Amino acid sequence: MQRKLIEIERRYDELTQLLSDPEVIGNQSEWQKYAKAQAGMTDIVEAFREYSEVVKHLEETQGLLEEKLDPEFKEMAELELEELTEKRDELEEKMRILLLPKDPNDDKNVIMEIRAGAGGEEAALFAGDLYRMYTKYAEHQGWRTELLSASYTDIGGFKEIIFLIEGQGAYSKLKFESGVHRVQRVPTTESGGRIHTSTTTVAVLPEAEEVDVAINPNDLRIDIFCSSGPGGQSVNTTQSAVRITHVPTGTVVSCQDEKSQLKNKEKALRVLRARLLERAQEEAMGELASERRSQVGTGDRSERIRTYNFPQGRVTDHRIGLTLHRLDSILLGELDEVINALITTDQAERLKSEA
């Protein structure tokens, strides 16, 4: 590990010099490329430099303890040695995590798709609860959200809702949300007070850039129709809604939320591009993914990942056995404790497989 860290630090210093070179400064695309590469190394280089300082002080303290010291000074040195040893171990663990292969999608924006599953109207209402939970979480993170497409039900739920989350590290934090979310509660339409169980499916896709997925316009069939609102009522007399079919894969995306046909087409293409990227990555990783199923789950949309129990105010993530009795705050977007636990478990599993 030491040799690898020294090499990373050397390259980091090279990039620092390049970024101050007048020729590089004059070439913006080249400067941005180097700046991005250096930014990706900053955390590991800072940790390594701090680690080197700690090791140096540790050796000095160990040397002191080999000398004859008065009892009070010796006690202070022993205490410092203990603290430095603990700090060294923490930094070693941190560096091991930072050296893990990075998911190339981690810095991408996210397209989230939430679909009502079993449970009819109650599942559709819960889809709305999850949509609000994720938009609130995004707000807490300082990210931007944009509605891309929605299919409403008569009582204000969603059969399906698709939205974009833009922000630094959005995919790295939200990727473990893919799967089946189960809700247990008494529906507002239930007169007998019985608890019903409903499900909603969440898919988290990294937003694909045009360079990630090349779409041949000849492979697309584009249909235009009138958009409709809850209950099938027409909300727009002009034909602004767009349905795009990618003929080779049979992937279909519809968008009708904008009054402009052009904007609906742009949004539909963003979703289509993300789905095609996911499809390509799944095909490429299929064999590897089946061999390396981490404790945090498969990311499969059919996997039941979490239960939200309203009568008990409880949220349980089944992949890591985490139960929290603060459902209200979680639905208000306070997801950090859940998401950080999932990330930590994933890192631990990957460290184990790298060992």
UniProtKB/Swiss-Prot annotation:
It is found in: Cytoplasm. Keywords: Cytoplasm, Methylation, Protein biosynthesis. GO terms for cellular component: cytoplasm. Methylated by PrmC. Methylation increases the termination efficiency of RF1. InterPro entries: PCRF, Pep_chain_release_fac_I, Pep_chain_release_fac_I_sf, Prokaryotic/Mito_RF, RF-1. Pfam families: PCRF, RF-1. The keyword Cytoplasm applies. Disulfide bonds: none annotated. One of its GO terms (molecular function) is translation release factor activity, codon specific. Its main location: cytoplasm. The modification N5-methylglutamine is found at residue 233. PANTHER family: LD18447P. Belongs to the prokaryotic/mitochondrial release factor family. Peptide chain release factor 1 directs the termination of translation in response to the peptide chain termination codons UAG and UAA. NCBIfam families: prfA (TIGR00019), PRK00591.1 (NF001859). HAMAP family: Rel_fac_1 (MF_00093). This is Peptide chain release factor 1. It comes from Desulfitobacterium hafniense (strain DSM 10664 / DCB-2).
